[in-house]
A protein has these predicted regions:
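Selective transmembrane-helix segments that form parts of the transport pathway or gating/packing helices
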Residues: 94, 98, 102, 141, ...
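Short, membrane-interfacial amphipathic segments enriched in basic
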Residues: 40-84, 261-262, 266
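Membrane-interfacial helix-loop-helix connectors in multipass membrane proteins
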Residues: 115-139, 205-248, 252, 256-275, ...
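Hydrophobic alpha-helical transmembrane segments of multi-pass membrane transport proteins
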Residues: 129-172, 200, 257
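Final/C-terminal transmembrane alpha-helix of multipass membrane proteins
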Residues: 272, 278-294
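Active-site cofactor/substrate anionic-group-binding motifs, chiefly glycine-
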Residues: 91-145
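Short cytoplasmic-facing helical segments at TM-TM junctions of multi-pass membrane proteins
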Residues: 162-187, 269-272
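Short, positively charged and aromatic/hydrophobic N-terminal segments
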Residues: 14, 20, 24-27, 31-35
């Protein structure tokens, strides 16, 4: 038996198959697919989901860092574990960092003197070069540039060293032997950073000011008396105390963040590289935030 499909006439006299809609537009249009609508909604909400996950991850990291900080404070009385390691860490974190800090401070002082001379030409007495070099190096550039440089050197070194110990299960071995890994690995590094960062900053700042003075003598036709006049003009002892406070906080920041990312490393060699990068980036960001915080609260 043959089934004959009937056809009907659409607009304009055209023959239209009965399975099709002769009016594809207008009120008879098919509703949008729920799947497509869901996909479109998901694409619009995706940035908010990523933001939420990032916020949760950040909060979790801060919580884990707080746990390590609490363990570190409880481990400080165990001097018998970390006491003999402190001097070695002070040498690695402080003494070995002096060359790069002095190198940065030297050229910073030279540039500051030249830029101050260029800015003050014909408008301000030239001895204000000493004022600008001294104030800027002591209050800002000395501590901050040194802190950023040491975050790359010290923070990366700590994160890489502890991260390697974590992925090779050396830290787990210390726990198995009833050794407190926090007292053995974290406390001496953090205390060394707190003690040595101010010393390195003072040396770097002094060299930066001296470099500005020599630049003024050789290139700006200034005398030592003129430079010293400007240097003493607005100098206050509080400036040095302010720089020391900042450097103390920078030392704590760089070493504690390096220890945290090293201790939480996972994923083998790739994880060590990721932890090292994160330690440098996060400590540099926190240094800049602390710089603004101390300026807003203490100046």
């Amino acid at each position: 038996m043959v089934v004959r499909r009937s056809s009907r006439q659409g607009p304009g006299g055209n023959i239209v198959d009965p399975g099709t809609n002769p009016h594809p537009q207008g009120g008879d249009a098919l509703p949008p697919s729920p799947i497509l609508m869901r996909m479109k909604g998901d694409s619009l909400l995706a940035p908010f989901g990523m933001l939420g996950r990032s916020a949760l991850d950040t909060a979790a990291q801060i919580g884990r860092w707080g746990g390590l900080a609490s363990d570190t404070i409880r481990a400080i009385p165990r001097v018998g574990i970390w006491g003999r390691l402190l001097l070695g860490q002070m040498a690695r974190i402080g003494v070995d960092s002096v060359p790069i800090a002095l190198f940065i401070a030297t050229f910073t002082g030279v540039v500051m003197a030249l830029q101050a001379s260029y800015t003050f030409t014909g408008a301000v007495p030239l001895y204000f070069v000493g004022t600008l070099v001294g104030k800027t190096m002591v209050l800002e550039l000395g501590p901050v540039l040194t802190g950023l440089a040491l975050s790359g050197r010290v923070g990366a070194n700590i994160a890489a060293e502890l991260g390697t110990m974590r992925v090779t299960e050396q830290i787990d071995a210390l726990e198995t032997l009833a050794y407190d890994p926090v007292a053995y690995l974290v406390v001496p590094r953090i205390l060394a950073g707190i003690l040595m960062f101010p010393i390195v900053v003072i040396l770097a700042t002094s060299v930066g000011v001296a470099a500005g003075w020599l630049t003024s003598l050789q290139l700006l036709d200034m005398s030592t008396a003129e430079f010293m006049k400007g240097l003493r003009l607005f100098f206050e002892p509080w400036d040095v105390q302010f720089a020391i406070i900042k450097s103390l906080s920078f030392g704590l920041t760089v070493t504690s963040i390096g220890c945290f990312f090293g201790f939480t490393t996972e994923g083998g060699a790739e994880g060590v590289g990721i932890s090292t990068t994160r330690a440098v980036v996060v400590s540099s960001m926190v240094i800049l935030v602390l710089d603004a915080f101390w300026a807003a609260t203490l100046l």
